Amino acid sequence: MISEAVLDELQKIVTSPFVFTDQETLLNYSHDQTEDLSFPPQVVVKPESAQEISDILKLANHHKIPVTPIGARTGLSGGALSIFGGIGLSLERLNKIIEIDEKNLQVTVEPAVITQVLQEAVLEKGLFY
């Protein structure tokens, strides 16, 4: 069980409304598209920066709390399920295109960038993804 003290620390790292303990949210983050598997985390946290992720991981490590990174929950292998409970680390707010390097044909993106958004951004530069 995650203590109130840890929840308070999470609230300091990622301010409301991005720390969730309500049953509806936990249920929504308990599954992906894998049939018949449901493992709710004890808390869902939605950071918006690498620093917030680092601080969450430091806190979780200090208290030996498992952390499961969660994306769009469209996977078919159960890889993003919180089978040990703990913290569900939703990456959905990390959705920015950091850089489009036209010379080297590379992009740097955050993990939740939507493919169509990326395709449209590079198309504006005459590129294709």
Predicted feature descriptions by range:
Residues 1-33, 62-65:
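N-terminal accessory segments
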Residues 10, 35-67, 91-129:
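N-terminal glycine-rich flavin-associated loop
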Residues 37-39, 81-86:
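A short, glycine/Asx- and small/polar-enriched loop/turn
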Residues 53, 76-77:
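Short glycine/serine/threonine-rich phosphate/pyrophosphate-binding segments
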Residues 77, 88-91:
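Short, acidic (Asp/Glu-rich) active-site segment that either coordinates a divalent metal cofactor
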Residues 78-83, 119-121:
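Short acidic, glycine/serine/threonine-rich loops at helix termini
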